[in-house]
Curated annotation (Swiss-Prot):
PANTHER family: ELECTRON TRANSFER FLAVOPROTEIN BETA SUBUNIT LYSINE METHYLTRANSFERASE (PTHR43648:SF1). It comes from Klebsiella pneumoniae subsp. pneumoniae (strain ATCC 700721 / MGH 78578). Pfam families: PrmA. Methylates ribosomal protein L11. It is found in: Cytoplasm. This is Ribosomal protein L11 methyltransferase. The keyword Lyase does not apply. Keywords: Cytoplasm, Methyltransferase, S-adenosyl-L-methionine, Transferase.
Length: 293
């Protein structure tokens, strides 16, 4: 069905209040967008980090009386009569189908392909990971995921144990298993990610070699030959004491989800325990790898 979109411009400090006002006026969903396309880094736990100049966008059913919506919003103390706004009709699309149509098989390194589960594989002799990300992050399209997949493809994983810290869709853990790892362990704070990883592991025939845990359930003695963590710079710094103990002595560590401008601070958090390689960059993002001393 078609939708109507109403956009307001405000400050980050007022965005939450106007979001509530739009919901009270009948909006079925709210989106925050940066007016000037400025990067916003990860928030602290419990914090909603917003830009200084923020667009608040409400989505309304096509049958909504938008004149009545505007009249209601004019009563809000942050808006008032004649407040600036933009209303537009959105084209009726099958958004899920459009997304699926634009998700194509992708090659990473020499051996590895990530293929949507609804498409044919381009090379049956390659290492093919069939993926349906569901509600969890991780398709290989983001530079950080790509950097991690290329790194895994270049390793000799035969017989190794791999930990995917922040596993999302399970893409890295499953790729490691398909590349020869004997066992993979996925950890994520989101139960939906655990379920998506479980479904994708079953789709790829590696369920019996993949263990999945929420952080509070993971074994204390857990160790691996290779540890990969594609999360964000802040958590990578804060969790460095926890992540650093996961690789065995001489084990490998791969970190991403890091902007190139954040690489130095992340490297500092791991430099005491790891011999770090040169940082690899891709599209303003980077990957940090090293071997445990």
């Amino acid at each position: 069905m078609p939708w109507i979109q109403l956009k307001l411009n405000t400050t980050g400090a007022n965005a939450e209040d106007l979001s509530d006002a739009l919901m009270e006026a009948g909006s079925v969903s709210i989106t925050f967008q940066d007016t000037h396309d400025t990067p916003v880094f990860e928030p602290l736990p419990g914090e909603t980090r917003l830009w200084g100049d923020t667009d608040v966008i409400g989505l309304f059913d096509a049958e909504t009386d938008m004149k009545a919506v505007v009249a209601q919003l004019e009563q809000h103390p942050l808006l008032g009569a004649g407040f600036a706004h933009k209303i537009e009709q959105l084209e009726d699309k099958d958004w899920e189908r459009e997304w699926m149509d634009n998700f194509h098989p992708m090659r990473f390194g020499e051996r590895l392909w990530i293929c949507p589960s609804w498409r044919d594989v381009p090379d049956e002799n390659a290492v093919n990971v069939m993926l349906d990300p569901g509600l969890a992050f991780g398709t290989g399209t983001h530079p950080t995921t790509s950097l991690c997949l290329q790194w895994l493809d270049g390793l000799d994983l035969n017989g190794k144990t791999v930990i995917d810290f922040g596993c999302g869709s399970g893409i890295l853990a499953i790729a490691a298993l398909k590349l020869g790892a004997a066992k993979a362990i996925g950890i994520d704070i989101d139960p939906q990610a655990i379920q998506a990883s479980r479904d994708n592991a079953q789709r790829n025939g590696v369920s019996e070699r993949l263990e999945l845990y929420l952080p509070q359930d993971q074994p204390e003695s857990m160790k691996a030959d290779v540890v990969v963590a594609n999360i964000l710079a802040g958590p990578l710094r804060e969790l460095a004491p926890l992540i650093s103990v996961l690789p065995v002595s001489g084990g490998l560590l791969g970190l991403s989800g890091i902007l190139a401008s954040q690489a130095e601070s992340v490297c500092e958090a791991y430099a005491d325990l790891f011999a770090l390689d040169p940082v690899v960059e891709k599209e303003e993002w980077c990957r940090i790898t090293g071997r445990k001393n």
